[in-house]
Structures are given as C-alpha cells and as structure tokens.
C-alpha cells in the first residue's frame, strides 16, 4: 500500500445528504440488476411458447447468463481496482439495459439468447465494481450490517423481478423487459450525480492521512494475483460458493415449480404464471432477515476472528431440513381461474390463512430463507476484512465466478 502526499483532494459534494443519496443510488442499482436476473424464470412458459422451443432452453439461457455475468465480472473488477470506478458502473448499467431492451424486442430464440448474454456482461460490472465502491463507504465495525442491506437490496430485486415478470408479463411477456429498460436508463442518469468515493476512505488506518490530503494510490496488478490466492481465507471464501450456489441456483425455478403445481390442478397458463410468481415471492421473503445475520456477525466478529464464518455456516446448515420440507410437502391451490391479476393475488394471499398446506409451506420457506440469508452479509464482510481496498473487487469477482458456475450447474440440473 502506498500513500501520496499532496493537497487535499477536491471532490464535488461529499456532505451527509450527498453521501446518503449516493448510497440510495447504489442500492437501487443493485436491486435493478437483480430485477433483471429474476425477470425471466416466471416467464419461461410464455417465452417458450412464443418462440416454439422447450422450456429447458429458457433454463439454458439463465444458466449461461449466470456464467457470462460471472466471467465478465472478473474483468470489470480488475479494471475497477485499477481505474476510476464511476464510468465503469455507468457503462455496465447501460449495457445491461440495452440487453434487457433487446430481450423484450427479440422475435426468435437466438436473438433473445444473444440479448440476454449482452445484459449479463453489463450485470457483471455492477455487482463486482459496486461491491468495491460500497466497501469504501463502510467502517469495519459495521460491515456486516451495511453489507446485509447491500445483499438485501439484491434479494429484493430478485423478488421484484419474479413479481414484475409474473404480473406484468402474464398477458404480454415482453412488457416487463421494456419497463425495466427504462428504469435502467433512469438509474444511469441518477448515478451521474453520486459522490466520488475515494479508495480506502473507510479504513481507520488511512483516515488521518487521507484527511490530510494524501491519496491512496496503490492499484492492483497481475503480480498481486498469487498474493490474493495465497490467502487461505480468500481460497475458502471463493470455493465455498461452488456447492452452496449449486443449491441456490435451483431456486430460480421456484416460480416454475408453483406454476406447474397450479397447472396440474387445472388452472390456465396465465393464471398459473401469476400464482407461481406470487407464491415464489412470498416464499422468499425470509431473506429480509439477512439484517439479523449481519448484526450477529458484527457482534460475534468482535469476540472472535471466526465470528462471521460461524454465523454463515450455522445458518446454511440449519436451513437444509426446511428446504426438504418445502419442496416435498403437497400444496393445495384455490384461486379464481381466468380472473384478473388483482383477484388472483388476493386469493393467493388469502390462502396463506385459509389453506393449512399453504400456511405450512410459507412458514417453512420463511425459516429456510431466514437462516440461509445469514451467509450473504458475512461473506461480503469477510472479503472486505481480509483484503486491502485495491484487491476487494477482484476477490469478490473471483468468488462470484465460482458462484456463477455453481448457480449455472444447479439451474441446469433442475432444468
């Protein structure tokens, strides 16, 4: 690490309101990216029918997109750790917006696949470069808590994608893609006015020097890669995602699982899509408890260096029995077939109370997701704790690459 002395850096804004605005924009960007990820699975059936292809080919699109996004993230992160991160984030957002818009305009399967892969390239930027930026806003003491919000924003985005895809796309599957494209362009414009966050500014060891006008000018190089992989903590943080995400990757099929259950009970395709999306959204609400996992991780980390790892491991292992119950317990669906979207949604929500099998399934899912969500904020925080500022984006992207392979494998196996 090196510090260069000089005049205090001139950065536009940087007051409390400006920093808060910047954090909000980052969170929204992370959410929108995951809306894009969650948009396709609820619409597998409708898109497959439109292009006259089997649903498994739409599952292949999702699996390959995971891989492309993960590979692209490594390149984005490496350049983000070397250069100004703000332009990279804006370019990445524009790329995924263009790919999402192209998906909505596609007239055949190959065009849809190409557009989704273009979007995946852009999505890789926001996750990896955005992570590097956010860690420079957070002091080590509160990393678990703030990273829980970062992870929560992504989870909410995925839920929103599932819900938006099912509700807006039940009649016309192209509509949600076009709506999301506009949202991506608006987010890019909002990002123009965010605070330029200085690399390393959240580190207590650098605070005094940076306040005195020094610049943290160390940048990653290829010579650093052996050092990064030589850290045992990094190796475990990267590799654990292969098996974990093989399981998590299959969760993108939840809307399809519940939609097919509805079809098996005689409901029409349009009603089944809405039912699948609403049930999948409800059943993943337990992810909001990642905040609790982050708080517990922060508290335990102050007592022992393995605190965050213990919280994450216990959460994942404890969730396994609940997932088994969720997937195999039968569920009776009672909604008005052919009714409007609002009526179907109200019926689904009412069935949580009126239908015991639905209530049991929801409780099981909430517990499973609540326990699993302890992993995300503590994984993020451990990467930041174990690495200097110029390495964090790259380490995150390497972990994300392995996660992407696991997600693609899980998605492909289920599909």
Give the residues covered by each predicted segment.
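Extracytoplasmic gate region of multi-pass secondary transporters
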Residues: 40-41, 231-286, 290-291, 376, ...
């Amino acid at each position: 690490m090196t510090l260069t002395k000089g005049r205090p850096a001139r950065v536009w804004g940087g007051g409390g309101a400006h920093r808060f605005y910047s954090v909000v924009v980052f969170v929204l960007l992370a959410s929108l990216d995951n809306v894009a990820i969650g948009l396709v699975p609820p619409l597998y059936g409708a898109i497959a029918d439109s292009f006259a292809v089997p649903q498994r080919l739409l599952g292949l699109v999702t699996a390959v997109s995971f891989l492309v996004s993960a590979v692209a993230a490594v390149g984005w992160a490496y350049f983000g750790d070397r250069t100004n991160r703000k332009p990279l984030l804006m370019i990445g957002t524009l790329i995924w917006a263009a790919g999402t818009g192209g998906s909505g305009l596609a007239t055949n399967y190959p065009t849809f696949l190409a557009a989704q892969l273009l979007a995946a390239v852009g999505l890789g930027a926001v996750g990896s470069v955005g992570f590097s930026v956010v860690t420079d806003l957070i002091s080590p003491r509160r990393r678990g808590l703030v990273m829980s919000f970062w992870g929560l924003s992504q989870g909410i985005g995925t839920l929103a994608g599932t819900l938006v895809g099912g509700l807006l796309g039940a009649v016309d599957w192209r509509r949600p893609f076009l709506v999301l494209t506009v949202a991506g362009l608006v987010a890019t414009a909002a990002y123009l006015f965010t605070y330029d966050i200085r690399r390393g500014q959240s580190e207590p060891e650098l605070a005094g020097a940076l306040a005195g006008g020094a610049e943290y000018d160390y940048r990653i190089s290829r010579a650093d890669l052996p050092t990064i992989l030589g850290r045992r903590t990094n190796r475990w943080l990267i590799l654990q995602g292969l098996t974990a995400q093989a399981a998590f990757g299959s969760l993108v099929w939840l809307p399809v699982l519940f939609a097919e259950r509805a079809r098996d009970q005689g409901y029409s395709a349009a009603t089944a899509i809405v039912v699948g999306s609403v049930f999948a959204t409800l059943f993943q609400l337990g992810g909001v408890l990642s905040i609790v996992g982050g708080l517990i991780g922060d508290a335990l980390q102050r007592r022992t260096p393995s605190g965050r790892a213990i919280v994450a491991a216990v959460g994942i292992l404890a969730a396994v029995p609940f997932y088994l119950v969720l997937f195999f317990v039968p569920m009776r669906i009672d909604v008005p077939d052919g009714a409007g979207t609002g009526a179907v949604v109200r019926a689904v929500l009412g069935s949580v109370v009126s239908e015991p099998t639905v209530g049991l399934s929801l409780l099981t899912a909430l517990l499973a997701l609540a326990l699993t969500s302890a992993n995300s904020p503590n994984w993020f925080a451990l990467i930041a704790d174990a690495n200097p500022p110029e390495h964090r984006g790259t380490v995150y992207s390497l972990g994300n690459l392995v996660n992407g392979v696991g997600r693609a494998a899980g998605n492909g196996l289920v599909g």
